[in-house]
Amino acid sequence: MVSKIMNKKYEKGLSLIESAMVLALAATVTAGVMFYYQSASDSNKSQNAISEVMSATSAINGLYIGQTSYSGLDSTILLNTSAIPDNYKDTTNKKITNPFGGELNVGPANNNTAFGYYLTLTRLDKAACVSLATLNLGTSAKGYGVNISGENNITSFGNSADQAAKSTAITPAEAATACKNTDSTNKVTYFMK
């Protein structure tokens, strides 16, 4: 009788191997949750950036309707509208931020008629760059660019997104090649009519 009680006493609880298996399972579940959370967070940031671009475009088009040019267009004009959500307005530095921690820069074309104005999203990681570079703005867009400089001085649009402005929407394959910076220094530019 005493031995039965002792055996039951020793059978209670988990063995070391069982405890290790439970901890391993918990770690796997936690890692999976973190992975999917990060993926959902990145997707949400991309959607917010797209909404920000669309809102800025709509506001600019509304403000400049009937005007002959976009002369004087810059971020401070958009800061004074309701088109940009307050959490992306840096009124102290007169900048518009984007969901990835960079900026949304806007400006007119410099004395050329290749396009009307541009919008550039900066400090994008590779995944965000690919996602945002493939955004097709339809007939409102004159061209697209990835990691190009001197946006306001572009005078023509080519057929490739590699180091140049492109006249048509950027394909995912082109974006994967053009978004080459792995240190969150990519930028995507939309050239609007």
UniProtKB/Swiss-Prot annotation:
Membrane topology summary: Single-pass membrane protein
GO cellular component: membrane; pilus
Keyword Cell cycle: no
Phenotype on disruption: Deletion mutants cause significantly less diarrhea in volonteers.
Principal location: other
Entry function: Major component of type IV bundle-forming pili (BFP) that plays a role in adherence to host cells and virulence.
Disulfide bonds listed in the record: 129-179
Similarity comment text for this entry: Belongs to the N-Me-Phe pilin family.
Name of the protein in question: Major structural subunit of bundle-forming pilus
Subunit structure: 10 to 100 laterally aligned filaments or bundle-forming pili coalesce into rope-like bundles. These form linkages between the bacteria within the enteropathogenic E.coli (EPEC) microcolonies that are attached to epithelial cells.
Cell compartments where the protein resides: Fimbrium; Membrane
Family matches, as Gene3D superfamilies: TcpA-like pilin (3.30.1690.10)
Tagged with keyword Transmembrane: yes
Superkingdom of the organism of origin: Bacteria
Organism the protein comes from: Escherichia coli O127:H6 (strain E2348/69 / EPEC)
